[in-house]
Amino acid sequence: MERLYYLNHAPIDFHFAQTPRDFVVEEIPLYPFSGAGEHLVLKIRKRNLSTFELVDILSSHLGIKSREIGYAGLKDKSALTLQHLSIPAKFGDKLEAFDHPEVKILEQVRHENKIRIGHLKGNRFFIRLKKLSPLNSLKIQGVLEEIKRWGIPNYFGYQRFGNDGNNHEIGRKIAHGEQRVTSPKRRTFLLSAYQSKLFNEWLKERIKLSKILAEFTPSEASRLAPMIPVEQLKALQKQPHPFKILPGEILHHYPHGKIFVAEDMEEESRRFVEKDIVPAGLLSGTKAKSSEGIAHLYEAPFIDEKIQEQGSRRLAWIFPEDLEYRYIEEEAHGELNFYLPKGSYATVLIEELAHREIKID
């Protein structure tokens, strides 16, 4: 997908190689583990392995089925990652003989429950940018200040769409009955990619609208956004945040909490700037709460009623936390540390920073 960036700076030149040395991810658990129970939680460091491959390695060694192993989220293959997996505690003794060149078990602790998908708070990242000139490093510092203030769009990253970038196309064919996939897990995975594609296209369209409101007078903007009355365009332009909240928008308490429909636009826009709430985009499917009014007019083109998977809402905007940057001039390297809520992609932040698509080695 050709992404639309919300910031307006020129592209910044640097090299990013997604390798275990230059890309480190640490999962932050949703809650502390209790120290007692029938499950054994393993804190594992892996490199050059996907989470699925890690699960297969562990299940083979332990002699158990893959579905008996729990994990909170999928971690990148081309990275050094730290994440938690759970196994039935009765198989813990077999770990004494476990040895793998790309996997190290750092900690073990008992817990009452199996780890489930989504049971994480977020992820902490370390990223190294290479071939970075002093001038471009200064540009990065300026852009990072904007990101600290306003946040970034919560696009799904390229990883969501598979190695060939076409998982969403297969998902659309499944939804429309044009292709069959026998594996329920694979089917859900591909349909999820299609939902993600629709979300990204909606978010791109909304950023386009926000840019129109920033760059044109209300009368000029009305020709480019004819679904919105001129008086409403004027009100939207007064919102302080670059991403404009529309009447009838579904909003989400940030980063966790309930969703609700925007009503008091002045109050909601203030809370958005204060990082208390954010717009929530649609993952098209059944049982998802619908937006209303003008917001629904912009959402409707990205709803596919053929999708029978359950729909939901996803944060459309996120605020990176603990964002730190340092430049090592003698090596022409920049080093970034930051935290993102679960489900968000570090590569999306890097592309917003670079203002261009990042070529992944």
UniProtKB/Swiss-Prot annotation:
Pfam families assigned: TruD (PF01142)
CDD domains in the cross-refs: PseudoU_synth_EcTruD
HAMAP family, alphabetized: TruD
Keyword Nucleotidyltransferase (UniProt): no
Protein function: Responsible for synthesis of pseudouridine from uracil-13 in transfer RNAs.
Active site: 76 (nucleophile)
A single MF term (Gene Ontology): RNA binding
NCBIfam families given in the database record: PRK00984.1-3, tRNA_TruD_broad
Record domain TRUD: where: 151-318
Family per record: Belongs to the pseudouridine synthase TruD family.
Catalytic activity entry: uridine(13) in tRNA = pseudouridine(13) in tRNA
The protein, known as: tRNA pseudouridine synthase D
GO cellular component terms attached to this protein's record: cytosol
Gene Ontology biological process: tRNA pseudouridine synthesis
The EC number(s) this enzyme carries: 5.4.99.27
Record keywords: Isomerase, tRNA processing
InterPro entries membership: PsdUridine_synth_cat_dom_sf, PsdUridine_synth_TruD, PsdUridine_synth_TruD_CS, PsdUridine_synth_TruD_insert, TruD_catalytic, TruD_pseudoU_synthase
